[in-house]
Amino acid sequence: LLAAAAGAAAGDKCGRNEFQCRNGKCISYKWVCDGSSECQDGSDEWEQTCMSLTCKSDDFSCGGRLNRCIPGHWKCDGQQDCEDGSDELGCAPKTCSQDEFRCAEGACISRLFACDGEPDCPDGSDEASCAPSTCGPAHFRCNSSSCVPALWACDGEPDCDDGSDEWPARCGARPSPQPGRGPCSRHEFHCGSGECVHASWRCDGDADCRDGSDERDCAAATCRPDEFQCSDGTCIHGSRQCDQQQDCGDMSDEVGCVNVTLCEGPDKFKCHSGECISLDKVCNSARDCQDWSDEPIKECATNECMRGNGGCSHTCFDLRIGHECHCPKGYRLVDQRRCEDINECEDPDICSQLCVNLAGSYKCECRAGFQLDPHSQACKAVDSIAYLFFTNRHEVRKMTLDRSEYTSLIANLKNVVALDAEVASNRIYWSDLSQRKIYSAQIDGAHGFPAYDTVISSDLQAPDGLAVDWIHGHIYWTDSVLGTVSVADTRGFRRKTLFRQEGSKPRAIVVDPAHGFMYWTDWGVPAKIEKGGLNGVDVYSLVTEDIQWPNGITLDLSSGRLYWVDSKLHSISSIDVNGGNRKTVLEDEQRLAHPFSLAIFEDKVFWTDVINEAIFSANRLTGSDVHLVAENLLSPEDIVLFHNLTQPRGVNWCEKTALPNGGCQYLCLPAPQINSHSPKFTCACPDGTLLAADMRSCRTEADVILSTQRASTAARPQLTGSPAGTTQEPLTEPTLSTLETATTSQQALHNADGRGSEGTPRSVGALSVVLPIALLGLLCLGALVLWKNWRLRSVHSINFDNPVYQKTTEDEVHICRSQDGYTYPSRQMVSLEDDVA
């Protein structure tokens, strides 16, 4: 009765979404029957408790002892989610639709891919039994029988698999490039396959060109004195030999190693005199150590755990000599005696998304829109299907994650590289390196030949990276030739260069519009990963060490971590958005031979590899479970994951103000949210113009010059005619180039005035009148000075040792006073050379 009363009293304390343990403790219902016990008595995992649970109508019941419930669309998705695999039992065979081709091994591909000259089925059956292809009048027939548009022939870029569209027999001999005008700079090596790589990568033992030409005709490698030469001829640092890790490809660095770590393990005892004996020889009344340290009389006869538990907070374990304090699972020993709880949540990768620390353990939870997979403990999306969009040089393809089958989204492109999507508007954006343009198209109408719009068509050289700000309606892109990062609205009407640096080579870019930041890779010298505000302010480097050729970059918003691939180090790495907690997810020279781009969804990372011509996936937390997603792809480059959860909704502060576009005349750009006092947005003007004094409207440099001249002209009469308290509206200070232009203009005006006054007849008559008046004035002034000196001799003066000066209103100076509280103070360059001159 007492137990029942206590249980009833405790039951009143539990909420509607809580489960009451048998001992009265309250836990969340989502923790019941999840495979780990949160109740101290284990009642949340009892069989009778789990069998009493009922799944929702649209869920699937796994049955068994735990009777777990999973979303209904997880059944027959090719992934085992139930503990016993019952969700993948009794599934109907996969069927292909009418517009799909069924491969011999069962996979489905678009019929457009059958007999197109490229094997898309894993077994190549889509290219078997194909009739010889016939090219239309607007196409060129390659030597391999495939067809490419006739406009692509002899354009300097090989489009046929065998390069026959650029053979000299058809196109003629091409003139050799003049010195200094080649496609690569003097600090780069020109690969035989066309691309440019760092000159320092030539003959470094690692093929960086697609055709491996950077490693041809190289002298035999010799190792330095501080290096170890592997049996295959490669060199590693000497400290890596016998470090219990295989660093040589042939594992020769771990052959013939002698274990010098003696006296380690629970069955060993090290004497004070240096000998190592087995533990069973301690306290056996025999001298095994030279100094008798194995036979201390007092310690051998004492069980320290019998007195006060040996001072241990939890478990005391008696040894032959002394004792040890042990801690239960989930705790650690902090001072050889006391145990404290381990906060497992300090590891950012301990959980898929959210981590809840508990006494002695932890719990993983998921954000809204995701559900925890009871089998893999991964957070999986519960709503719409996720798609992978990737570029295949001449087209954009779409792949479903649950079937790994793809269709053509946009075909007949020249050299598509960068790609991104706007989920809410169902629109994709891409850049074409050959056309030097950025395009967009509606996904609904994209069935191989969609109508697409030209967004940016000028002032582009190599738009290698592209990112869409889905909250504020902007696109950001990089240009590795110009060394710039730029922004424009999604229609391309308004654009601005945000970042430009000599020698930089920005490549991939990703944005976080909710917090106002962008991140991009730069494989210039030195290589780095940069971070800056979406309005172009506060740019600094996040990663500068252990990085050589950073290519693709992506941001996992759910965990707040950046992931990037390094094509030189053959690795996938990650950091938090502030540059800390760096981790290497995966290193693999085979499957990361030349990674180009990557994407994140749920617990998987997907990447494209140019050399393997494939798409791979792996666990983003551990780097394990590497799978081949798609193969036989022609130059797969950018990859984007399309799902509504990858682009969560946010507030567009530029549209929340009373004035449209935030009151900005040109562009309203989100500002980085560094702290709670950060502005929500700032205004920006097109290249070659400046913000006006109101920090919202724009004006040209010519307007600045005229304003400067007017201010200097109006200032002269103010010295005598203006009241002391009068102030003028502050003007935006001109830049250095503006100052030089203003100086030149004023000098020209001065010269013009001088030329206009030369040779005037009136000047002679005026001079004859002014000179007598001036002489008379000087005589009067001299008489006045003599009279004042005579008066001062008869006046006694009083001197104050500590004079006090009263400040008047003429001394007030207002510096950088802004009329808009949501703007940054303008950064201007001041030159002292003009003052010195």
Swiss-Prot record:
The chain crosses the membrane at residues 766-787. The modification Phosphothreonine is found at residue 720. Residues 788-837 are annotated as: Required for MYLIP-triggered down-regulation of LDLR. Residues 12-52, 53-93, 94-132, 133-173, 182-220, 221-259, 261-300 form the LDL-receptor class A domain. Glycans are attached at residues 143, 259, 644. Its main location: membrane. Belongs to the LDLR family. This is Low-density lipoprotein receptor. It comes from Oryctolagus cuniculus (Rabbit). The lineage of its organism: Eukaryota, Metazoa, Chordata, Craniata, Vertebrata.
